[in-house]
């Protein structure tokens, strides 16, 4: 097993202007320890700052006009409809393709966009993995192509967390006064629950891989 390892965590829209006050209040001790024992800096972004475009630029080292991912949506196969962006239109290799080509191991979880999962030397769990698209009482079927290798789909499917599984203990740290929110009029708690469930699902898959797979 290679002792020299790199872990890249994508934190969409993270800004030191928001993070520094939280660290100063002692609310992000783990990140604060990483900052104090390492190096930090500000990244220049691209314009317009569209997440799939930026994430693909990071993964490929190319600008959008070269890598081909330009926004949140793309034209469907029929040429008439619009669908959430996938990696189908990416024109160049991502870092995980290059590592596979060189015989190195890599794992990818939830990178945007990474669907359909690519046959890399490792595990890839696409960004279509975490979002619950059905009510809790209906089957939560994983879309084909979400996991590589495909034989691990059932395993990772069992790690997913549905927003309806969250309890008050999960919501209270973010909205202490959540009990007084009129959810009939205000949908922000519902949106927050989806975000927490999505992030927790990605975290569950990522930490399982770190613990059980060579990297």
List PLM regions with ranges:
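Glycine-centered flexibility sites
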Residues: 10-13, 26, 38, 61, ...
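Glycine-/proline-rich flexible loop or hinge segments
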Residues: 13-17, 36-41, 50-54, 72-84
């Amino acid at each position: 097993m290679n002792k020299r390892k790199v872990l890249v965590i994508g934190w969409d829209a993270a800004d030191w202007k928001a993070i520094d006050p939280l660290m100063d209040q002692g609310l992000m001790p783990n990140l604060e320890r990483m900052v104090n024992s390492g190096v930090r800096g500000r990244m220049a972004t691209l314009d317009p700052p569209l997440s799939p475009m930026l994430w693909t630029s990071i993964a490929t080292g190319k600008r959008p006009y070269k890598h081909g991912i330009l926004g949140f949506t793309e034209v469907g196969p029929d040429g008439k409809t619009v669908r959430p962006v996938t990696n189908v239109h990416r024109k160049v290799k991502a870092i995980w393709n290059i590592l596979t080509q060189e015989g190195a191991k890599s794992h990818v979880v939830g990178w945007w966009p990474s669907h359909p999962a690519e046959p890399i030397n490792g595990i890839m769990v696409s960004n279509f993995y975490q979002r619950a698209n059905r009510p809790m009482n209906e089957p939560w079927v994983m879309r084909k192509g979400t996991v590589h290798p495909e034989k691990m789909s059932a395993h990772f499917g069992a790690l997913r967390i549905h927003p309806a599984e969250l309890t008050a203990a999960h919501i209270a740290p973010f909205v202490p006064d959540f009990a007084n929110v009129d959810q009939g009029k205000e949908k922000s708690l519902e949106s927050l629950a989806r975000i927490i469930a999505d992030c927790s699902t990605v975290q569950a898959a990522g930490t399982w891989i770190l613990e059980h797979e060579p990297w």
